[in-house]
């Protein structure tokens, strides 16, 4: 189990997919094979359920067995909004749990990233000069990693 402590808060123009891409840079497409990524830290209070889903879904790109977040008040409110509060259960790490590895990601230091062809771990800074004159003729919004109402609403505001 790899514990990923998330601290800080994402800056404008950065989203949770950038956190997942940062992890892909570190671990590659096979770095998560046979591993569980467990997310923790004070930064969780800044992540809504769809954002957490983006991170866990992107875990598959690293080959992870699974990715998990503890339940908290945000989770409880999500269940309540779905009329499923009766299904809510407390799910947190045991006191004194040990891990095979532990890393910390300061979300305030994450920059916008791009997954380039032809592998998900071919990651580049979105502001890299190689993208300066790149013309984008179409985009795809709706995958398991960016299909929440919030993602689609942002794209609409940008006229994508």
What are these regions, as identified by a protein language model?
Residues 1-160:
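Fe-S-dependent hydro-lyases/dehydratases of central metabolism
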């Amino acid at each position: 189990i790899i514990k990923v402590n998330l601290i800080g808060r994402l800056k404008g123009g950065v989203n949770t997919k950038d956190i997942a891409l940062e992890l892909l840079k570190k671990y590659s497409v096979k770095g998560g094979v046979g591993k569980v990524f467990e997310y923790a830290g004070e930064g969780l209070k800044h992540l809504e359920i769809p954002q957490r889903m983006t991170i866990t879904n992107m875990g598959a790109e690293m080959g992870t067995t699974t990715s998990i977040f503890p339940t908290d008040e945000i989770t409880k409110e999500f269940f309540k909004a779905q009329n499923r509060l009766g299904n809510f259960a407390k799910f947190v790490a045991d006191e004194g749990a040990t891990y095979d590895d532990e890393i910390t990601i300061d979300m305030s230091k994450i920059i916008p990233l791009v997954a380039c062809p032809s592998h998900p771990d071919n990651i580049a800074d979105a502001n890299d000069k190689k993208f300066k004159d790149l013309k984008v003729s179409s985009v795809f919004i709706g995958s398991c990693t960016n299909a929440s109402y919030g993602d689609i609403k942002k794209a609409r505001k940008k006229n994508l």
